[in-house]
Amino acid sequence: MNLIKCYQTNSSWYKGAKRNSTPVGILWHATAAGNPTLKRYVQPMETDANYQEMITLLGKNKYGNDWNHIEHEAGLNAWIGQLADGSIATIQAGEWTTTPWGCGAGSKGSCNGYIKTSSSRTYNGQHWVQFEICDDGYKDKQYFDKVY
C-alpha cells in the first residue's frame, strides 16, 4: 500500500476534532461521485513545507472544492484513490487517533465517536477509523480491485 500523509489542517473538522480517541473499528465508504482522483478531495496548504511535492503527487484541484477548507466540517482519517500519475494511493488526512466526522448517526450512536442520549449526543472517547474510496462510477473492474 502506498500511504502518503497530507493532513487537512485547515478544515473545520481537523481544527475541532477530538484527539487521542481510541479506534475501535474501521468504516469505509465510497464517494459515489464517479471521480477517482484524490485531488478532488485532498489538497495541501500552500504553507506546507512539502506543498509542491504534494501537488505533483496529487495534482492541483483547479476548482478549490477540496475538503481542506474552513467551511468543510466533515473530515476523514484517509482517502483512497488515484494520484496524478494514475497510480493508486491512500492519503492519510488526519491522525488515526483523531475522531473523524464522515458518517451520520442512528439510534445507537455514530461511528464518529458519539453515543445518543435522550435528546443529545455524548462523546464516548472511541471512534471508527474512517476512509473514503474515490470511486470511478464503478466502470473499471481493475480500478475497483485495486482500491477495494
Please report, for each region that a protein language model flagged, where it lies by residue.
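Active-site-adjacent loop/helix surface patches within enzyme catalytic domains
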Residues: 1-148
